[in-house]
Amino acid sequence: MRPLDIVELAEPEEVEVLEPEEDFEQFLLPVINEMREDIAALSREHGRAYLRNRSKLWEMDNMLIQIKTQVEASEESALNHLQNPDDGAEGRGTKRCEKAEEKAKEIAKMAEMLVELVRRIEKSESS
């Protein structure tokens, strides 16, 4: 490295110094106003996000209540079937098949609702 020559040093440029009032009005005031707008927009979005999340939770809660109600009804139906078996030997097989198909449909519907609930939970966690 070689030492710097005094000639190589650049003369400092003169910068126009503004009065404090002009500086505030020209530079700081627009920035402050923009920051206020950003804060207001963020506050509004925060409120909307809270309401969206609350709505999703209510929706999931209602879906869980529906699933619980269907499971309880299915259990009750199965218990009633066990307590009151059909007396006819011929019709017993066909009725049991019909009831088994009905239960399979109910279980499939509950499974679909559970899958939908899990998807909504995953979707709400990702957003």
Swiss-Prot record:
InterPro entries: MRFAP1. Its main location: nucleus. Signal peptide: none annotated. It is found in: Nucleus; Cytoplasm, Perinuclear region. Residues 76-97 are annotated as: Disordered. Keywords: Coiled coil, Cytoplasm, Nucleus. Belongs to the MORF4 family-associated protein family. GO terms for cellular component: nucleus; perinuclear region of cytoplasm. Residues 92-126 form a coiled coil. Found in a complex composed of MORF4L1, MRFAP1 and RB1. Interacts via its N-terminus with MORF4L1. Interacts with CSTB and MORF4L2. This is MORF4 family-associated protein 1. The gene is MRFAP1.
